[in-house]
């Protein structure tokens, strides 16, 4: 069978074609598979769509019952998993859902939820038994056109976990167009003319996708080519639900809890469908359950009218804007609900205008897709908008059953692709891909339009790879650059709209020696499943090294605004490296003299050393690691300068490998453990590197620190040097990846001790780091519960000089799960009112280099690039 699966944000569906049923081989009949699912307690029915919801109850029901039960107990409902797959601010493989349930209630990862939805459909198909196991069929699984490579790979991983290892990915707008071809082409071909441009406007529950397809016609011969794809927009029907929920909460006149808001949102989603689809329905009543012992008696009531829903939908999301009006660049989205980073401007009109201007094409026709456009009034509004912009009304290509169009189109594509019958849309890869060179340039790896199976090679004389150590590449992509060719070096203009992906990394093993340069060719291929495969081929051997995405790491988004990096000549760097060798290899320079001598030869104070120079020094310190054992003084200097040059452990190519090298000395401890200063510098060293370590590595450090900081009941606190204790606390507080419960215990223990001994700057820094609403490097799913931060704010209410701590503990993120309650925020605001910190507290300004340095505990290297 030729199967299409729509893994939707709100609803999923499965359709198939039996080639043996095709009387007309170009347009075979498409069947929709009805999916059995629980619709009420003890009742199972088959439905044409599977709501993309999982309810965390016995058996973890999926679908209609899960969605409806979630409206009653929203903190046990998992939804919008597809939106989370594209959210690089979190670890998408970690158990972070449901987001609003808090750490103890988060039991599934976005990948696991997606796998469960797919496996539910697979189990239903297999149990039906008519056509053999689903895993043996020709399957096409759809993804948003704007999904980047990381999100696509995670989608494939989810399918593999669900038992579907063999499949192809197809972009949802293309699937919608294939559905139109399958169901309408024969009778609508008269509408098609040569040069015609069709806009596919696909707005679902969580994402908006725009694509353009151009028609080529020569008599009866008609071809379609995709010519443009819009960038990823986390904006859809969910945002309208949130807007209606905001309106209802305003009318209720009471601030609701997270649980109440989740239930309200589900009611508003149902109200939206009723009010926008049925003009006879003038209002819908909204009921919000009370909290605590007065769940029923304390319930709240209001209503949403059709007029209100229309005004918000039409004027808020589809306003009749001027053609040249661009999306508004707000500091953060007004609709950042439940952790998802929705776009700041909800006006789909402005995003569509920006896309069409970038594409440089005027649509002659529109094909709508996605649940957002089920109400006819919203489809009409987009047609009005295009007529308003271009002076002509576009032809409307109708797709029946918008909830099923993607699945049926995917099934048609599976059929056409595997049988050679039917019609295929050309267009290939929607992005051009580049390997970054320096800060502002790159070499084109794969051009936009590369077709499935195409192999591209970049063979340049100047391409060499460092062997016998891990290497990392910056991978960039563009949706708008159309003329670049493989191997071309491009200097990107300032403001170029580039997407920076998670880095590509590989371990290059070559020969038995140490580091060496190997001449290579770069290769890439758009695989049959629709993902990008990249590799390096040696020119002097048969070796091939695959480059893999580091999906657990956040991709770098924007450089931190701050000091420009100084430029230091290679001769000066070489002189600085020779000073280090003179000190550690030859003993010609006393270790305590080395910092001043380095500053003198570099002509810069050490806080101004650029990151590239610092990392070259760090590499030499790591090479000379055994030389630290010459004396206690040498170890102190090695730890102090080595850690300083490697701080903060990430943000520069090769840092992961440097951390692995540094970790080799951890288990043995300091070489001169009986010296207090060596122990102090030992913990400073690991605190500086903490951001580059993974969860397990940080756990090793915590395991060694915690007995000294929080002894088990019945054991006395070990007496130690105050400076050593202070640095141990700072290092423990820098471990953002250890369990939240452990970090809560650390903060509580520190506050308890400080109430007896006093609140010094180190205590305040540790508390601010542990309870930060926006972590220095950790993903958003590692932020401590807002109730904990609120409790710590109250504990600091009467303590002087807490402005920085208050900003960290109470900074607004726009995510109600992370933001502290109003009372705690008011305490923090009262401490910073009238100071420059108020903008940071309100979340109105991005964290600049100074703010990040304050969070880290010291200045960061100039030129360092961190995630925004």
Model-derived segments and their meaning:
Residues 1-25, 185-226, 377, 516-541:
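Gly/Thr-rich phosphate-binding beta-strand-loop-beta motif of the actin/hexokinase/Hsp70
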Residues 1-95, 168-171, 175, 219-226, ...:
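Early-domain small/polar-rich strand-loop-helix modules and first-structured segments
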Residues 116-131, 179-191, 315-363, 381, ...:
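Phosphate/ATP-binding catalytic cores across multiple sugar-kinase/actin-like superfamilies
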Residues 165, 288-359, 421-638, 642-653, ...:
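Acidic low-complexity intrinsically disordered segments
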Residues 139-154, 292-293, 340-345, 362-385, ...:
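Glycine-rich phosphate-binding loops at beta-strand->alpha-helix junctions
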Residues 169-201, 405-424:
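Conserved phosphate-binding catalytic cores of ATP/NTP-utilizing and phosphoryl-transfer enzymes
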């Amino acid at each position: 069978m030729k199967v299409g699966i729509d893994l939707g944000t709100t609803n999923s569906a499965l359709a198939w074609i039996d080639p043996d049923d095709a009387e007309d081989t170009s347009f075979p009949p498409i069947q929709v598979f009805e999916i059995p699912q629980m619709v009420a307690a003890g009742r199972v029915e088959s439905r044409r769509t599977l709501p993309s919801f999982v309810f965390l109850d016995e058996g973890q029901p999926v679908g209609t019952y899960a969605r409806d039960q979630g409206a009653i107990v929203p903190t046990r409902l998992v939804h919008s998993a597809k939106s989370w797959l594209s959210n690089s601010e979190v670890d998408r493989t970690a158990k972070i859902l449901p987001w609003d349930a808090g750490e103890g209630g988060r039991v599934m990862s976005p990948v696991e939820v997606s796998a469960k939805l797919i496996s539910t459909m697979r189990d239903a198909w297999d149990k039906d038994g008519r056509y053999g196991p689903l895993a043996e069929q020709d399957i096409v699984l759809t993804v948003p056109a704007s999904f980047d490579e990381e999100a696509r790979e995670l989608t494939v991983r989810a399918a593999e976990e669900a038992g579907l290892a063999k499949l192809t990915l197809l972009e949802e707008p293309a699937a919608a167009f294939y559905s139109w071809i399958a169901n309408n082409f024969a009778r609508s071909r008269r509408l098609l003319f040569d040069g015609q441009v069709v806009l596919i406007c696909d707005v679902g529950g969580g994402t908006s996708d725009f694509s353009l397809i151009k028609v080529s016609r020569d008599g009866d011969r008609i071809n379609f080519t995709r010519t443009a794809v819009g960038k990823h927009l986390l904006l859809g029907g969910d945002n309208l639900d949130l807007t209606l929920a905001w309106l209802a909460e305003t009318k209720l006149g009471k601030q609701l809890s997270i649980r109440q808001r989740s239930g309200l949102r589900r009611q508003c989603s149902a109200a939206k469908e009723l009010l926008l689809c049925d003009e006879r329905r003038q209002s819908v009543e909204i009921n919000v359950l009370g909290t605590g012992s007065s769940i029923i008696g304390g319930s709240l009531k209001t209503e949403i009218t059709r007029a209100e829903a229309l005004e918000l939908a039409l004027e808020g999301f589809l306003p009749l804007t001027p053609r040249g009006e661009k999306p508004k660049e707000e500091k953060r989205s007004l609709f950042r609900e439940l952790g998802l980073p929705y776009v700041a401007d909800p006006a789909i009109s402005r995003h569509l205008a920006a896309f069409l201007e970038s594409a440089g094409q005027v649509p002659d026709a529109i094909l709508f897709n996605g649940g957002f456009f089920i109400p006819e009034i919203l489809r009409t509004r987009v047609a009005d908008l295009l007529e308003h912009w271009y002076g002509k009304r576009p032809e409307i290509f109708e797709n029946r059953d918008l909830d099923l169009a993607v699945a049926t189109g995917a099934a048609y594509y599976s059929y056409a692709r595997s049988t050679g019958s039917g019609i295929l849309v050309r267009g290939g890869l929607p992005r051009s891909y580049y390997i970054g060179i320096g800060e502002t340039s790159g070499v084109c790896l794969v051009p936009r339009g590369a077709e499935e199976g195409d192999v591209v090679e970049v063979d340049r004389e100047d391409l060499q790879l460092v062997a016998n150590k891990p290497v990392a590449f910056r991978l960039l992509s563009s949706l708008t650059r159309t003329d670049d060719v493989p191997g071309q070096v491009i200097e990107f203009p300032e403001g170029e709209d580039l997407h920076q992906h998670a880095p590509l990394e590989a371990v290059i093993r070559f020969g038995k020696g140490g580091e060496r340069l190997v001449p290579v060719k770069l290769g890439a291929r758009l695989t049959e499943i629709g993902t990008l495969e990249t590799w390096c081929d040696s020119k002097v051997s048969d070796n091939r090294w695959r480059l893999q995405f580091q999906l657990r790491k956040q991709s770098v988004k924007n450089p931190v605004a701050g000091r420009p990096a100084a430029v230091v000549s290679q001769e000066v760097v070489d002189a600085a490296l020779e000073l280090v060798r003179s000190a550690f290899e030859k003993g010609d320079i006393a270790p305590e003299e080395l910092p001043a001598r380095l500053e003198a030869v570099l002509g810069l104070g050490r806080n101004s050393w650029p990151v590239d120079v610092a990392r070259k020094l760090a590499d030499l310190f790591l090479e000379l690691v055994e030389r630290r054992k010459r004396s206690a003084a040498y170890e102190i200097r090695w730890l102090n300068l080595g850690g300083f040059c490697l701080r903060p452990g990430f943000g520069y190519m090769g840092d992961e490998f440097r951390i692995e090298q540094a970790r080799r000395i951890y288990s043995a401890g300091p070489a001169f453990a009986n010296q207090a200063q060596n122990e102090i510098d030992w913990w400073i060293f690991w605190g500086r590197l903490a951001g580059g370590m993974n969860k397990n590595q940080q756990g090793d450090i915590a395991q060694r620190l915690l007995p000294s900081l929080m002894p088990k009941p019945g054991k006395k606190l070990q007496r130690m040097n105050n400076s050593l204790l202070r640095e141990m606390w700072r290092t423990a507080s820098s471990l953002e990846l250890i369990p939240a419960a452990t970090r809560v215990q650390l903060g509580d223990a520190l506050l308890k001790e400080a109430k007896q001994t006093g609140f010094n700057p180190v205590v305040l820094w540790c508390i601010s780091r542990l309870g930060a609403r926006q972590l220095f490097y950790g993903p958003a799913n590692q932020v401590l519960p807002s109730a904990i931060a609120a409790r710590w704010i109250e504990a600091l209410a009467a303590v002087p000089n807490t402005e920085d701590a208050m900003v960290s503990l109470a900074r607004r993120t726009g995510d109600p799960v992370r933001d502290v309650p109003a009372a705690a925020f008011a305490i923090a605001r009262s401490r910073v009112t009238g100071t420059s910190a108020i903008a940071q507290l309100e979340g109105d300004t991005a964290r600049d280099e100074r703010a990040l340095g304050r969070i880290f505990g010291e200045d960061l290297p100039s030129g360092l690039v961190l995630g925004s």
